[in-house]
Amino acid sequence: MGCVTASIACNHNSVISKEADYPIEVETGPEILTGSTRLKAGTAQKMILNMVSTATMVGIGKGNENLMVDLVRTNEKLEARLCNIVMEAAGCDRARAVQALSEAEGNGKVAIIMILSECGRLKAEEKLKEARGHVRRAVMQT
């Protein structure tokens, strides 16, 4: 098929590792409860997948520094979290973050760019598009 493949195995020299283009092997040793694969091995695999997905999210512009800036507000808790993220990323107070989020129609990335670049929503959206979704690149544009 020509697809690039990756694998995660919790044993050294596993069969799947030999078949994958990018094998990840982490030796967790035997499980405390023989026959179970959900304890050490399952936890290790979950941690690896979390690291891979986090790196991917940052790579495609969903993160800025250590902040998840591409958060969708689906409830009050996430709305408050997004406001806090905008405040931290833009170095502004709550009132300014709320105002920018309102003007940006809830788009945290656009709100951050609006504040840091001192521009309106349309210009911020344009800058974000030109920067391929990356807030830092958008802010650095002149």
Language-model regions: role of each:
Residues 51, 56-142:
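Short, amphipathic alpha-helical interaction segments embedded in low-complexity terminal/linker regions
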Residues 1-47, 51, 56-60:
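Glycine-rich phosphate-binding loops that contact phosphosugars or nucleotide phosphates
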